[in-house]
Amino acid sequence: VDFITTHQYAGDPISEMCNQSEEDHNQTTEEIQQEYQVDMAQLFAGLKPEDGLLPMFRRVMPENTETADLNRDLLRDAALQVRQQANGLPVYYTEWNACATFGAPGNDTRKIAAYDVRAALCAEDALEGSSVWCFSDIFEELHPFPEEFHGGFGMMSQHGIPKPVYHALRLLNQAGDERLELPGALDGEISTAAFCDAAHTQLTVMTTKQNLHHFAELQTPATPVELEVTLDAAPKSVEICRIDEEHGNPLKCWQQMGEPEDLTPAQVQQITAESAVTYEKLPFTYENGAAHVTFTLGTNDIAFVRFVK
């Protein structure tokens, strides 16, 4: 054996790797099947033929991250556990994400973006490599849905419209070649990571108010964030790129359009343009060797703040 590869989802309805007791680990396949049996007649009660396939699908495969309180550190805790069990072999997470089921409404929102960015950074030291599942809503396990935003696993919709998680991982990739050590910075209500480019001409700070509790329902007031960065000289500029309700939110654009099915090329182009994210100037002050900026973060918002030297 040369390496270990595994998959994990925070909302996995069966494995719940980090939440299992010793009794759970000893369950037989038959016991697990019995536990998850459902009354199909009761499950589909109230559904009408005109409701379409998606509501039925969501009843058959409910998503834990939409209904339950889950530990946001599941991926990190499990990765450390797997690495210990691997006895020195390289560990790869070749498939992971927050939602374990296709059709989960959160898959189209910034809730997934915030989870994936923070989880990837938290588990970085435990893994040789990892791959978020998956890149596009078009994949071989299910047929296409008429709804453009139907809770597919992809970072892009079936017509190639970038979702919040696509924007977040792209910005993370572009943040810099060197990650700075900030012990404990990912563990608070506001999680933070910092990066600089190879030439040390710019510093980028990622912040997110990521929360996995009651994934679909949790709404809390925006939190004021005061960011202080020590620099040898005042930066030439400071810029911010946001992923929130108004930025990088193609689902909202589609809903405001009336949730059309089978999008036209013009509609795809419009939603893509309206939900694009770009860096904008952010006012700052510089005194006593430090640059200071302020902004706000709502639940599962993400902000990348770039200090250009």
Residues covered by each model-derived region:
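Flexible, active-site-proximal loop/turn residues at the rims of small-molecule/cofactor binding pockets
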Residues: A10, S136, K309
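C-terminal beta-strand-rich structural cap/linker in extracellular carbohydrate-active enzymes
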Residues: D262-K309
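Noncatalytic carbohydrate-binding groove/subsite architecture in carbohydrate-active enzymes
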Residues: V1-A120, D125-A126
